[in-house]
Amino acid sequence: MTSLSGLIRVMRKRALMSQENFAKALNVSVGTINRWENAKTNPNITAMKKIKAFCEENNIPFDEIEAAWIAQEE
């Protein structure tokens, strides 16, 4: 399984977004996106809901991201 941080980065790049634009879309700080993508911290449940909604709106698969998040929470 790919790391959660790597999957978040790939998802953002699939959407052709900068960290700044992705942060605005999720209503989080750029620093938060940077910490997620560099495995400094993981998204909380509220952020995961925002990520899921973003994926659904942009036709980006969410299953692998969700599985990686659940695995890291255990």
Descriptions of predicted regions:
Residues 40-53:
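Short, basic-rich loop-to-helix N-cap that marks the start of a DNA-contacting helix
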Residues 6-21, 50:
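Short basic helix-loop element that most often maps to the first helix and adjoining turn
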Residues 7-8, 27-28, 51-63:
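Secretory-pathway ectodomains
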Residues 45-46, 62-74:
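Short, charged recognition helix plus adjacent turn
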Residues 9, 13, 27, 38-40:
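Residue-level detection of the helix-turn-helix DNA-binding "recognition helix"
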Residues 16-35:
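Short alpha-helical DNA-recognition segment
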Residues 1-3, 70-71:
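A detector for short, charged/polar N-terminal pre-domain segments
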